[in-house]
């Protein structure tokens, strides 16, 4: 009974977000023709290909975001972001309707807390990814640079909660946890040994042109008899930053 009452109380606290007074529709469409010439220096010879390509620089998307003021400096809101292939119209992110981000948040003088599907701290994705600016290419070009530079495993996760502190002296601290990172590809139970779980702490420092990022994250892989049973739990430490000189950024 206590669990039921607690769940009702949480839902009631966030119910106002469904009637957000300020809703924004946004999107990106990246579509063009792509020509490639490949010569592997084998008996097969060179190949040429001309095709329509979606998302060469930035993934096509559309989204909705809204905010409702509750008073006393507290507000609730949501972000719903869909990914799709612009050349076919097909849904992306394993056929999810809002696969790029689906979050409900509350923020105020205490900081910000959000729930749902979101980018992990050690990614450049969504509202809470911290490390996208560590690469000069960010998350563009299909995220290929992002994936090989500072990130291991999933870049967006289901069943996730994140807390962001207020900013003090340029510092902001983050904590994130996913009870089951990807529910579409495995028969799992949240917070149990047969689910892939994620823990992370992160911090940013911003002072004018100087931006610093640090994260520590851990993957607690499925320990059941599933496909992940041979994987050791992972631990990643990421440090980086940038400085904007005006004419160039390093």
Which residue ranges define each predicted feature?
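Outer-membrane beta-barrel proteins
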Residues: 1-250
């Amino acid at each position: 009974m206590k669990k039921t009452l607690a769940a009702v109380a949480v839902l009631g606290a966030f119910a106002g977000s469904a009637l957000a007074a300020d809703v924004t529709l946004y999107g990106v469409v990246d579509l063009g023709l792509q020509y490639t010439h490949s010569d592997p220096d084998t008996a097969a010879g060179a190949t040429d290909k001309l095709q329509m390509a979606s998302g060469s620089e930035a993934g096509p998307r559309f989204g909705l975001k809204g905010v409702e003021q509750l008073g006393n400096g507290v507000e609730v809101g949501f972000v719903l972001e869909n990914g799709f292939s612009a050349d076919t119209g097909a849904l992306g992110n394993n056929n999810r309707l809002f696969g790029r981000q689906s979050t409900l948040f509350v923020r105020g003088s205490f900081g910000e807390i959000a729930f749902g599907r979101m980018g992990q701290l050690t990614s450049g994705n969504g509202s809470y990814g911290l490390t996208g600016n560590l690469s000069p290419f960010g998350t563009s070009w299909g995220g290929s640079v992002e994936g090989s530079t500072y990130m291991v495993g999933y870049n967006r996760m289901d069943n996730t909660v994140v807390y962001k502190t207020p900013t003090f002296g340029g510092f902001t601290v983050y904590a994130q946890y996913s009870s089951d990172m990807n529910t579409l590809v495995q028969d799992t139970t949240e917070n149990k040994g047969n689910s892939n779980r994620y823990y992370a702490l992160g911090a940013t420092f911003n002072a004018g042109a100087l931006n610093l990022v640090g994260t520590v994250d851990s993957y607690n892989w499925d320990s059941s008899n599933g496909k992940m049973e041979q994987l050791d739990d992972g631990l990643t430490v990421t440090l980086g930053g940038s400085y904007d000189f005006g004419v160039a950024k390093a």
